[in-house]
Amino acid sequence: MAETQNDPLLPGYSFNAHLVAGLTPIEANGYLDFFIDRPLGMKGYILNLTIRGEGVINNNGEQFVCRPGDILLFPPGEIHHYGRHPDASEWYHQWVYFRPRAYWQEWLTWPTIFAQTGFFRPDEARQPHFSELFGQIISAGQGEGRYSELLAINLLEQLLLRRMAVINESLHPPMDSRVRDACQYISDHLADSHFDIASVAQHVCLSPSRLSHLFRQQLGISVLSWREDQRISQAKLLLSTTRMPIATVGRNVGFDDQLYFSRVFKKCTGASPSEFRAGCE
């Protein structure tokens, strides 16, 4: 029987956790000076922040050189083929492997450098803050206290939100707090099979018609369409990262009838739930 690998910096580590974080200090000709090669990617996401030196990311013939301050996001299934740039003497990068909470999906849609590999570079003034958050996530994630993992996940959520705040600050006016609260309420009640707009409107102290108008004005989509997108996104996440029965996945996103869930899922994704899950394995 093969020996279990307990070092996440070395090949063979299972990453069978909600969050694993660390620092990979690659020096030329050192014991970590090899290329990570995962052609099928991983089941979770990986965030990667370069802090020293240069790394090179390869993807089907394309290449990207990452430098200090660059943050990359590898989603589930994305090719992982990266290592120290041959012209650099070192590549130090911090990383966080995680399985996201359902309502994070919007925050994980990043501009890409190629394929599905996301990219974000904070401006010079903000880089120290993002670097500090990364360090706090790693410190919490490697802790052994009862709440260490939960603290790390919450710090990661803060990092993702701070990136969203930076992007929105430069591209969009602030979202109406009532629309934001409505989105949060909907995300928190995806399993409610008796959902209606009136309950959301009541929660944010608006009439259903006013909420519908504001929602479409700010997000460019109806309340029901946005909820449907969130349900399908959550279903895809559960299908790809758990062995939960399909009927249970459906109930988790508000479908009491498995056949109806399968029809809606296939209409939205082009594949049945079982076909989608098989494609993720």
Swiss-Prot record:
Keyword Acetylation: no
GO BP annotations, alphabetical order: arabinose catabolic process
Keywords: Activator, Arabinose catabolism, Carbohydrate metabolism, Cytoplasm, DNA-binding, Repressor, Transcription, Transcription regulation
Example GO molecular function: sequence-specific DNA binding
InterPro entries, alphabetized: AraC-bd, Homeodomain-like_sf, HTH-like, HTH_AraC, HTH_AraC-typ_CS, Tscrpt_reg_AraC-type_HTH
Protein's organism: Salmonella typhimurium (strain LT2 / SGSC1412 / ATCC 700720)
Family matches, as SUPFAM superfamilies: Homeodomain-like, Regulatory protein AraC
Gene name, Swiss-Prot/TrEMBL: araC
DNA-binding region listed in the record: 198-219, 246-269
Protein name per the record: Arabinose operon regulatory protein
Pfam families, per the entry: AraC_binding, HTH_18
Gene Ontology cellular component annotations, sorted alphabetically: cytoplasm
SMART domains: HTH_ARAC
Residue numbers binding alpha-L-arabinopyanose: P8, T24, R38, Y82, H93
Location relative to the cell: Cytoplasm
Disulfide-bond pairs as recorded: none
Function: Transcription factor that regulates the expression of several genes involved in the transport and metabolism of L-arabinose.
Residue ranges constituting the HTH araC/xylS-type domain according to the UniProt record: 180-279
Organism domain of life: Bacteria
Subunit structure: Homodimer.
